């Protein structure tokens, strides 16, 4: 899974003022990497209106609606490390993983991310990481 995380799509020490701003940043990174079209960002916001993508342990995993599958060019991930946290429907989120999955691949990605974040130690390591490589290593170890 770490192969879907390029160093260019891992953003350290991000400051955002709102959940909406965090979704926009994650979505823009997916657009910039060529994984999705611009329309996918709105689909990420639309999904959030229907159901929160907060997963617990300081993690949110915004992704597009099922109808937005046509806006996915190839699978991709982006990660925002937000050490100060951002309010996410009353919860504090310190890591946002934006997800775009092609051909149903997002379900596998969601599962692997949830497993990684089920360990509090992994969450702490990601929030405190000083480099993209450190973050990728946490996922590689969890995926082993």
UniProtKB/Swiss-Prot annotation:
Residues 3-142 form the PTS EIIA type-2 domain. Keywords: Cytoplasm, Kinase, Phosphoprotein, Phosphotransferase system, Sugar transport, Transferase, Transport. It is found in: Cytoplasm. One of its GO terms (cellular component) is plasma membrane. GO terms for molecular function: kinase activity; protein-phosphocysteine-sugar phosphotransferase activity. Pfam families: PTS_EIIA_2. GO terms for biological process: phosphoenolpyruvate-dependent sugar phosphotransferase system. The modification Phosphohistidine is found at residue 63. The active site is at residue 63. The keyword Cytoplasm applies. It comes from the Bacteria. InterPro entries: PTrfase/Anion_transptr, PTS_EIIA_type-2_dom, Sugar_PTS. The phosphoenolpyruvate-dependent sugar phosphotransferase system (sugar PTS), a major carbohydrate active transport system, catalyzes the phosphorylation of incoming sugar substrates concomitantly with their translocation across the cell membrane. The enzyme II CmtAB PTS system is involved in D-mannitol transport. Homodimer or homotrimer. Seems to be a monomer when not phosphorylated. The PTS EIIA type-2 domain is phosphorylated by phospho-HPr on a histidyl residue. Then, it transfers the phosphoryl group to the PTS EIIB type-2 domain. This is Mannitol-specific phosphotransferase enzyme IIA component. It comes from Staphylococcus aureus (strain Mu50 / ATCC 700699).
């Amino acid at each position: 899974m770490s192969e879907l995380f390029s160093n260019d799509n891992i953003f350290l020490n991000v400051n955002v003022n709102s959940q909406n701003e965090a979704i926009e940043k994650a979505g823009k990174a997916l657009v910039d990497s060529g994984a999705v079209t611009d329309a996918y960002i709105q689909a990420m916001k639309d999904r959030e209106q229907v159901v929160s993508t907060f997963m617990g342990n300081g993690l949110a995993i915004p992704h597009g609606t099922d109808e937005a599958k046509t806006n996915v060019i190839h699978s991709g991930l982006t990660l925002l490390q937000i050490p100060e946290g951002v309010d996410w429907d009353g919860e504090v989120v310190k890591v946002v993983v934006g997800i775009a999955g092609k051909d149903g691949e997002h379900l596998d990605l969601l599962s692997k991310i949830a497993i990684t974040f089920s360990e509090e130690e992994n969450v702490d390591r990601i929030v405190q990481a000083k480099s993209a490589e450190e973050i990728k290593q946490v996922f590689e170890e969890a995926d082993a």
